[in-house]
Amino acid sequence: MDVKAAPNGVATIEDRILRITGYYGYYPGYSSQKSTTRSSVTRCKPGPNCPSSHSSISRQLSPLSVTEDSSAPILELQSRGSSGVCGRRVERQSRSGDDGTQTRPESSSQENGLKARCLSCTSMVLKTIWGLLIILSVSSSWVGTTQIVKITYKNFYCPFFMTWFSTNWNIMFFPVYYSGHLATAQEKQSPIKKFRECSRIFGEDGLTLKLFLKRTAPFSILWTLTNYLYLLALKKLTATDVSALFCCNKAFVFLLSWIVLKDRFMGVRIVAAIMAITGIVMMAYADNFHADSIIGVAFAVGSASTSALYKVLFKMFLGSANFGEAAHFVSTLGFFNLIFISFTPIILYFTKVEHWSSFAALPWGCLCGMAGLWLAFNILVNVGVVLTYPILISIGTVLSVPGNAAVDLLKQEVIFNVVRLAATIIICIGFLLMLLPEEWDEITLRFINSLKEKKSEEHVEDLTDVSVHLRSRSRVNGTVSIPLA
């Protein structure tokens, strides 16, 4: 229904409303021309044709204006509105495209991070499993060696011959290593090439006759002396006492490294060394300072001291060695023992110090079992450093003490009094303190701080949960509660 024009020139009700409300850009006849412009104005859609649509809108709206000044605000609003919508849509598309390109590398980096974490977790689990197996193997081989020596002493007591015989088995260390190399390595090398590669532990020129005599002789003597004193101690003391006293070598290694190699001073290791010395004195006191007990303790402490000196000199002159270099070096010690130290058991045999009736009377089963377990112990110690954490190897060594104690109790060869038990525990605790890393205090502080942060976070979460619960209850009851946090 048409409405007649009013005296003030307003033709329709819509024009009246627009005039009363003060619509920006109002001009007379706006409502009558609006219907014609709706059909001609096209909405802007995102795409390359958006600017052309803007120009068509301006061309179609320009005849509607009565004057240039009255139509300018409308054109400006129309163009701004349309360009704003189009621009926002185009910006959204471009942003979504940019976000898509940015999320792809982020997602790929997240996938790589997850893969790396999975691999690290898998390697950690494998190292732990290997560590547990090697702990059992190391402790079992050391306990077996000690107990077989005690059994052999019942019918055959020639400690130096037993030491010489077991040291000769070290020659098989490198062949065992090379067999593992052939079984696991992708690029296999010849025995001579691998031998030359591993001989770099002696220097860039490899193993020469001069280096063979200069470097191998002192280490071979220390190796033989360590094992010989250990076997002598087993004649005077029980297997539990000797294995516990031998654990003092960690304390002696620290003291020698601190004095000779100028290693870092650590108070906790000084405490461990004092505990080891205390355990030694208590072990001698356990039998009321009996003559055999004191001599046995001296032999065991001497074995631990020569073992510590061997390790410190190895670190000083040869440095660190990988598994192949260690296998080469131990096999070289076996060759040196076979060539240059064989005259010693011969002299002891003819001087009746270590004499046996015939070679057929020798307990070959016990001798081969002792030598095989000793070789297995040395191989496991060097393999364990490659497959798992070195600290687990040391734990396997200290676990030989309760292992020997269990066997001695079953054989009823030892009676544990309070002093002997306390001495054994003190030495084992000192050994474990020696295994603490150099940054153990910083690691402990970090761990304590992380625990405090977790507790504070849990406390804040509990407070927020309580406040949310109180709010919900107050809303149900129609009251307003003040949040606690």
Curated annotation (Swiss-Prot):
Pfam families: EamA
Signal peptide (from-to): none
Main location: membrane
Highest taxon in the source lineage: Eukaryota
Compositional bias annotation for Basic and acidic residues: 88-98
Region Disordered, annotated ranges: 32-64, 78-111
Membrane topology: Multi-pass membrane protein
Domain EamA intervals: 225-285
Biased composition (Polar residues): 32-42, 50-64, 99-111
Entry keyword set: Membrane, Transmembrane, Transmembrane helix, Transport
Protein localization: Membrane
Annotated Gene Ontology cellular component terms: membrane
InterPro entries to which the protein is assigned, alphabetical: EamA_dom, Solute_c_fam_35_mem_F3/F4
Transmembrane segments: 129-149, 156-176, 217-234, 241-261, 265-285, 294-314, 329-349, 359-381, 383-405, 414-434
Membership in a protein family: Belongs to the SLC35F solute transporter family.
Role according to the record: Putative solute transporter.
Name of the protein this chain belongs to: Solute carrier family 35 member F4
Annotated organism of origin: Mus musculus (Mouse)
